[in-house]
Regions:
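Solvent-exposed coil/turn segments that connect beta secondary-structure elements
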Residues: 203-206
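Surface-exposed patches in mature extracellular/periplasmic domains of secreted proteins
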Residues: 127-131, 191-199, 212, 256-267, ...
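Surface-exposed, polar/charged faces of alpha-helical domains
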Residues: 103-106, 216, 262
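Cell-wall glycan-active module
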Residues: 1-185, 271, 279-317
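Generic anion/oxyanion-binding catalytic loop in active/binding sites
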Residues: 21, 218, 236
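Glycine- and aromatic-rich loop/turn segments at beta-sheet edges
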Residues: 211-217
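Alpha-helical segment that forms one wall of the substrate-binding/catalytic cleft
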Residues: 174-189, 195, 208, 221, ...
């Protein structure tokens, strides 16, 4: 979340980022809430059946049941494999398909979601990592490892499990080519490499899927505080194009691209946050097709009963 540069340092970490951080690698039962904004103590209103409901997933057991790796069924929610060998086969298929230009939506989005869950499984069972990564091509192995390390950095922001679901509305992400066009337009105008903007977009709102319903805090796909938006934004704070250009404008004012570390730290005053952004950016810099996977990552949220998937159309009532 970018801060108003002229107001001096503000060491708070984005409430949204902290909550997303804990489910950066979905699949584990994780514990977190905002360090800056305590989780509300009131219970959330039950979700009407007329809108998509949150899907609960529990943490895997210490000894999951081995599973075969069936052919993808794109009509069902993806599920990560339950043993190292099957996960290696599954992730090899996922990573190859994500890099195949002939694969498009809706299959592409489904595969990105499965990639997210597979990475979560590796986070849950780190002893599988050598087996799984060993089955991947070297370039792909580096991309997967970079994503796993980024997830570890974001989990450093974790805290207690929230007591209620967030004041969010979940919307569909804009198409890949459209968002890539926005990042590259911002890069051409402000000199900020596109993959840093994509990393912020991923970490802050899962490529614009999260719409905060509170007018008091950070808003929009790139999570601007209203005062900061007044200085660096133009147009609609909830518009991907306008928000991405504003983020590039802010980073430029904060020292980018000459000093990306400094500029990213100005965006959100957490070194773990900066480390994660750099790691995701390096994945996309070295392998631009990596964005195709990240674009499919979904919104998960931690609860007392496990992580829940907040699907497109979900809104807190």
């Amino acid at each position: 979340m970018p801060r108003q540069l002229s107001f001096g340092l503000d060491t708070r970490v984005s409430a949204l980022v902290v909550r997303l951080a804990c489910v950066a690698l979905a699949g584990a039962l994780v514990a977190c809430s905002s360090a800056a904004v305590p989780a509300p103590s009131v219970r959330f209103t039950p979700i009407p059946t007329a809108v998509p409901t949150a899907t609960t997933t529990t943490a895997p057991s210490d000894s999951p049941t081995p599973s075969a790796t069936p052919a993808p069924n794109y009509t069902e929610l993806p599920a990560a494999a339950n043993d190292a060998a099957a996960l290696a086969t599954q992730l090899s298929m996922v990573e190859a398909a994500l890099r195949d230009p002939k694969v498009t939506d809706p299959e592409l989005g489904w595969l990105g979601h499965l990639q997210q869950l597979d990475y979560g499984r590796l986070q849950d069972f780190p002893e599988w990592k050598e087996t799984v990564l060993g089955a991947l091509p070297e370039k792909t192995r580096a991309a997967v490892n970079g994503s796993l390390e980024a997830g570890k950095q974001l989990r450093l922001l974790s805290g207690p499990v929230p007591k209620s679901l967030p004041d969010w509305k979940i919307v569909a992400a804009a198409p890949i080519d459209e968002l890539l066009g926005f990042y590259k337009e911002a890069e051409a105008e402000f000199g900020i490499p596109w993959y840093y903007l994509a990393s912020i977009h991923l970490v802050e709102t899962r490529m614009g899927r999260i719409r905060g319903l509170s007018s008091a805090g950070a808003q929009g796909p790139m999570q601007f505080m209203p005062a900061t938006w007044a200085s660096y934004g133009t147009g609609d704070i909830n518009n991907d194009h306008d928000s991405i250009l504003a983020a590039a404008r802010y980073l430029k004012a904060a020292g980018a691209p000459d000093n990306m570390q400094k500029a990213l730290f100005a965006y959100n005053h957490s070194q773990a946050y900066v480390n994660a952004l750099v790691l995701y950016a390096e994945v996309m810099k070295n392998d631009p097709a990596g964005y195709r996977g990240y674009h499919g990552w979904q919104v998960y949220y931690p609860t007392q009963d496990g992580s829940v998937l907040l699907p497109v159309g979900w809104i807190k009532e």
